UniProtKB/Swiss-Prot annotation:
Gene: serS
Pfam families referenced in this protein's UniProt entry, alphabetically: Seryl_tRNA_N (PF02403), tRNA-synt_2b (PF00587)
Protein name (record): Serine--tRNA ligase
Enzyme Commission code: 6.1.1.11
Family statement drawn from the similarity comment of this UniProt entry: Belongs to the class-II aminoacyl-tRNA synthetase family. Type-1 seryl-tRNA synthetase subfamily.
Native organism: Arthrobacter sp. (strain FB24)
């Protein structure tokens, strides 16, 4: 949720953000109008209630016919107060509905446009060339080494499901363990998070549970399967006041994740690039508004550290405004080179959500004066970033393959695989 005071005082800034996203600018003026209506309704209610209180004192002092007349007026006034209160509640609800409809304000420097209008921040490493043999794709390799079974995944659960078995299961567990150890070394608190959350938690994180076709819902329980542990980690401190005096609070959550991929018909139907269920280690940070941009750079650096450990060529892109989720004010993606596709594919992303999620979830920090006396509270900033996920297996198998289909294990991963240096063909 955005700051309505900031929007009212700087509407052009929010209009520009909406334009950059390719979104409707008129919602800005609608929010300003709704806020004015809310304020007016609240003033009417408070004035009538003050008048009602004053009448109450008069009634207490009056006698006889005068008291009866005043009681009649009080009855009429009470009805007016009740109506004004209802009007104020309606105005408040209308404003909140509009506030929940507008995405986060983008930060300075985010490129305008849609999915293809990103900016390449940097490219690290060179895509591997295969002069001596034609590279196999990750699914063919996965079948040769007994790591991936799509056929039985479809038999058991349907399309876009799979089994990781043998070295495939071990490789994923190794990735997740290496990611979690790196996060712990960087000061993150490890978390195993729920994968089912309440609608208010999902909405508070910035997802539209009514219209988002990517979300699985358990209707009988009114619970939602998360597509990232970011959701549970964001809701962890809902309705709390945090102490950030010692620095940011950092969590690393590991969970299974679920996505319906409803808008992906016909895309990436082969292999495990786009699936309904996968595992992930997600970094999540609570910090001050002033420190958010620096934390975003740190998250990106930690993601790049993981990519370097896996010895993968990659690039970092600054995602265009129109391709940002509702909650993100800025997002960097790390994309690894996938040889058989001749393209970079996203492995990680990191988003600065500024105070958007915290306002929706009512997460604040205590603010002190220079003398240390309490000054009040304000919304914190939240950020997230992926450290490892099932999709990494795609890039690792393809980039490190040998002609026979075996795969060289990146040196940093070998200790998590019992010293295994090569994933052999069966």
């Amino acid at each position: 949720m955005i700051d309505v005071k900031d929007l009212s005082e700087n509407p052009d800034k929010f209009r520009a953000s909406q334009r950059a996203r390719g979104a409707d600018e008129s919602v800005v003026d609608a929010i300003i109008s709704a806020d004015a209506a809310r304020r007016a309704a609240l003033i009417r209610f408070e004035n009538l209630r003050a008048e009602q209180n004053a009448f109450g004192k008069k009634v207490a002092q009056a006698k006889g016919e005068e008291k009866q007349a005043l009681l009649a007026e009080v009855k009429v006034l009470a009805a007016s107060v009740k109506a004004a209160s209802a009007e104020a509640d309606v105005a408040q609800a209308q404003q909140e509905e509009l506030l929940r409809a507008i995405p986060n304000l983008i930060v300075d420097g985010v490129p305008e446009g849609g999915e293809d209008d990103y900016i390449v921040v940097k490219t690290v490493g060179e895509p591997r060339e295969f002069p001596d043999f034609e590279p196999k794709d990750h699914l063919e390799i996965g079948e040769l080494i007994g790591a991936i079974d799509m056929e039985r995944g479809a038999k058991v659960s349907g399309s876009r499901f799979y089994f990781l078995r043998g070295v495939g299961a071990r490789l994923e567990m190794a990735l997740l363990q290496m990611a979690m150890e790196q996060a712990i070394d960087a000061g993150f608190i490890p978390m195993i998070t729920p994968t089912l959350v309440r609608p208010e938690t999902m909405q508070g994180t910035g997802f539209d549970v009514k219209h988002d076709a990517e979300i699985y819902r358990l209707a009988e329980d009114d619970l939602y399967l998360v597509g990232t542990s970011e959701v549970a980690l964001a809701g962890y401190h809902a309705d709390e006041i945090l102490d950030l005096s010692a620095g940011p609070i950092r969590y690393a959550g590991q969970s299974s994740c679920y996505r319906r991929e409803a808008g992906s018909h016909g895309k990436d139907t082969r292999g495990i690039i786009r699936v309904h269920q996968f595992n992930k280690v997600e970094m999540f940070i609570y910090t001050t508004v002033e420190e958010a941009a620096a934390e975003h750079e740190r998250l990106l650096a930690w993601e790049e550290e993981m990519l370097a450990k896996c010895e993968l060529p990659y690039r970092v892109i600054d995602t265009a405004a129109g391709d940002l989720g509702n909650s993100a004010a800025r997002k960097f993606d790390c994309e690894a080179w996938v040889p058989t596709q001749g393209a970079y594919r996203e492995l990680t992303s990191t988003s600065n959500c500024t105070t958007f999620q915290a306002r929706r979830l009512n997460i604040r920090e205590r603010v002190l004066n220079e003398d240390g006396a309490p000054k009040g509270t304000r919304a914190v900033a939240t950020l997230n970033g992926t450290l490892a996920t099932t999709r990494w297996i795609v890039a690792i198998l393809e980039h490190h393959q040998n002609e026979d289909g075996s795969v060289n294990v990146p040196r940093a991963l070998q200790k998590y695989l019992g010293g295994l240096e090569v994933l052999p063909v069966l």
